[in-house]
Amino acid sequence: MLTSFKSSSSSSEDATATTTENPPPLCIASSSAATSASHHLRRLLFTAANFVSQSNFTAAQNLLSILSLNSSPHGDSTERLVHLFTKALSVRINRQQQDQTAETVATWTTNEMTMSNSTVFTSSVCKEQFLFRTKNNNSDFESCYYLWLNQLTPFIRFGHLTANQAILDATETNDNGALHILDLDISQGLQWPPLMQALAERSSNPSSPPPSLRITGCGRDVTGLNRTGDRLTRFADSLGLQFQFHTLVIVEEDLAGLLLQIRLLALSAVQGETIAVNCVHFLHKIFNDDGDMIGHFLSAIKSLNSRIVTMAEREANHGDHSFLNRFSEAVDHYMAIFDSLEATLPPNSRERLTLEQRWFGKEILDVVAAEETERKQRHRRFEIWEEMMKRFGFVNVPIGSFALSQAKLLLRLHYPSEGYNLQFLNNSLFLGWQNRPLFSVSSWK
């Protein structure tokens, strides 16, 4: 795909050189031309990205003006995708032109949802719509979007249920029933109620003591962690499950502190307690360019001698050093996600609009506009994680057949679209849309 737009860059540059300040929208002759128009929008988008990579900002901004007029958060999946990538490219241009510092993170402004489709993303508009700052990510809104993502798509549930089943399978012969889960990104704890219920039902003898569960939940917000612990404690009480919850606050960028906490956890392990480590949508956050951070982290996890390590990650290569490679990968990945949302949610769904603009839009902004240590979305494909895990002494534990059946049931009952598919490959389970894998879950020991 990159080859095709590179080959046409010279002609595109000639075309954009004469573009007026307020170019007319692209004309679509009939509905039968929609597919052709979508391909044309994508081709223009890649051409604009190529200009940005060459620091040809004038040509890029001319194309982005055209794209902003012909894309919309309310259009079809291609138009909605192009709308977000156009804005992200505009932000990247602004930052390169203004030589802004890279010690910040991306967030959306509150008025982003009401922005006019016809807005041309000049530098001043981009500065209003996107802010790069270090704090105030509005965790309450983030929590709301996360809940919507969990309810409206199978992505989160697929990872949670499959990882849970791997933990249950690995601890089925646990003699004393004492299980300690280290959850490295617990968020709101949505993963654990189904597992807690399964553990409570394991005791077939009413006279035997109920199983024991201890969860150490990691996160950056101590208030949010305490709320999660309170909810899980109340749920455990309703099941008669012996339960303890401990918080482990992770200070952003403080990997050394996290490693110390993990090693202290290994030293304080209760005798006879089975340890499970849950890395669901976490490892990509600490994958730096040279890989040393993830290496230190995996070594620390290995020192816990856990029964099982569960991992769920995106099937995308958003950590590539090359901006153009990363851009191309991101367009294909999010195109599949947007197509899946369009097929499973109503055309005027407010929830879909919010998820695309606020959740996935923020990710797209990070992948496209951020560089070096500032970029948080460093997803890697399964083969990269597989090689990394094996390098540090982990052995792949096959995902069981029941987990596959459970995932099929999840899709059939809650997301009945023919576009979703499951694939069992390399002892791991993949969720995809059409022919593109989107998420993978694997387990290790």
Curated annotation (Swiss-Prot):
Record motif VHIID, residues: 179-183
Sequence segments annotated as region (Leucine repeat II (LRII)): 227-259
Disruption phenotype: Plants fail to initiate axillary meristems and do not form lateral shoots during vegetative development.
Region (SAW): 369-445
Stretch list, region VHIID: 146-217
Region (Leucine repeat I (LRI)), start-end ranges: 39-127
Biased composition range(s): Low complexity: 1-21
Residue span, GRAS domain: 32-445
Tissue: Expressed in roots and flowers.
Compartments it resides in: Nucleus
Molecular function (Gene Ontology), one example: DNA-binding transcription factor activity
UniProt record, GO biological process: axillary shoot meristem initiation; regulation of DNA-templated transcription; secondary shoot formation
Keywords: Nucleus, Transcription, Transcription regulation
Alphabetical list of InterPro entries matching this protein: TF_GRAS (IPR005202)
Region described as Disordered: 1-26
Cellular-component GO terms for this entry: nucleus
Domain of life assignment: Eukaryota
Family the entry assigns: Belongs to the GRAS family.
Its job: Probable transcription factor required for axillary (lateral) shoot meristem formation during vegetative development. Seems to act upstream of REVOLUTA.
Name of the protein this chain belongs to: Scarecrow-like protein 18
Organism: Arabidopsis thaliana (Mouse-ear cress)
Name of the gene: SCL18
